[in-house]
From Swiss-Prot:
GO terms for cellular component: cytoplasm. Pfam families: Methyltransf_5. One of its GO terms (biological process) is rRNA base methylation. SUPFAM superfamilies: Putative methyltransferase TM0872, insert domain (SSF81799), S-adenosyl-L-methionine-dependent methyltransferases (SSF53335). Specifically methylates the N4 position of cytidine in position 1402 (C1402) of 16S rRNA. Keywords: Cytoplasm, Methyltransferase, rRNA processing, S-adenosyl-L-methionine, Transferase. InterPro entries: RsmH, SAM-dep_MeTrfase_MraW_recog, SAM-dependent_MTases_sf. This is Ribosomal RNA small subunit methyltransferase H. It catalyses: cytidine(1402) in 16S rRNA + S-adenosyl-L-methionine = N(4)-methylcytidine(1402) in 16S rRNA + S-adenosyl-L-homocysteine + H(+). Its main location: cytoplasm. It comes from the Bacteria.
Length: 307
């Protein structure tokens, strides 16, 4: 069954797991199964535990992976919650692709696109809070805060005021209407339109994407997972910063304060090693085949605890 979504950085993902002879790979963001399918094909001794919040993609994948039913288990869960449901002992690889699928972007009813007639942006359709509720209920200051924090828009306050003024006349009901209020011009030195950046900020807030990533990383650190490769694929600078800074902290053996002259912590706190000093990015060929992959970055960490 062909996937309606092209998995990003597929070759680097497979390469990162190539030395894993057997065991289980945890796919924290199954989507339409592109990465998981390639992993299963690459090594018949590997199994997959996968999860996603999107009911539509889960239905697709349950049919897609029927022939691999003895090698893959699929759960409806966010990627932080899945760690509470599984045995950590056999996990040898973890993949988290922190992005929206092409199908989610393209389906009008999902309301992710600036041209959509809907205004939704929920990755989990069972979630009650959507972009429509956010846009029509957040205060001016709350809107400005997410535009500045998640999209780094210098005109965040004036943008928030535009939205408040418009909804005071009539509730904002569609993404198309919202994007016309925001405007589609580009900021100076930015190739992406203001509307796309603002929509990205709204999506991050609706789905609590940064919280989800932080929760996942915290749970991995406190878990019993060991001798495993962790791949984090991000599409936003804030997500990449979280992965980068977390991996740096995990690699530290000494966690004493900087002013301490002599180590007092035992110098044994490292839980592994960073395998990518710089993030892996898509090749020119991949970007040509899938332009949406252009801003993807992947960082890899080898979890190796002192036990």
């Amino acid at each position: 069954m062909d996937s309606p979504h092209i998995p990003v950085l597929l070759k680097p993902v497979l390469n990162s797991f190539k030395d894993i002879k057997n065991g289980t790979i945890l796919d924290c963001t199954l989507g339409y199964g592109g990465h998981s399918e390639a992993i299963l094909i690459s090594n018949p001794n590997l199994k997959i535990i996968a999860c996603d919040r999107d009911s539509e993609s889960l239905s697709f994948c349950k049919a897609k992976f029927e022939k691999y039913s003895d090698r893959i288990k699929i759960y409806k869960s966010n990627f932080a919650g899945i760690l509470n449901k599984i045995d950590h002992e056999d996990i040898r690889g973890i993949l988290a692709d922190i992005g929206v699928s092409s199908l989610q972007l393209d389906l009008d009813e999902r309301g992710f696109s600036i041209n959509s007639n809907n205004l939704d942006m929920r990755m989990d359709k069972n979630q009650t809070f959507s972009a429509k509720e956010l846009i029509n209920s957040y205060s001016k200051d709350q809107l400005a805060d997410i535009f500045y924090k998640y999209a780094e828009l210098p005109n965040a306050k004036s943008l928030a005021q535009k939205i408040v003024d418009a909804r005071d006349k009539s509730p904002i009901k569609s993404a198309k209407e919202l994007s016309s209020i925001i405007g589609r011009s580009n900021l100076k030195n930015r190739s992406v339109s203001i509307a796309i950046l603002a929509f990205q900020a709204i999506r991050i807030e609706v789905n609590k994407e940064l919280d989800e990533l932080n929760n996942l990383l915290n749970l991995i650190k406190s878990s019993k997972i060991n001798n495993a490769i962790l791949d984090i694929i991000s599409f936003h600078s804030l997500e990449d910063k979280i992965a980068k800074s977390t991996f740096k902290e995990w690699e530290k053996s000494c966690i004493c304060d900087n002013f301490v002259m002599k180590c007092e912590c035992g110098n044994n706190h490292s839980i592994g090693k960073i395998l990518t000093k710089k993030p892996i990015t898509p090749s020119e060929d991949e970007i040509k085949q899938n332009p949406r992959s252009s801003c993807a970055k992947m960082r890899i960490f080898h979890i190796q605890r002192n036990v």
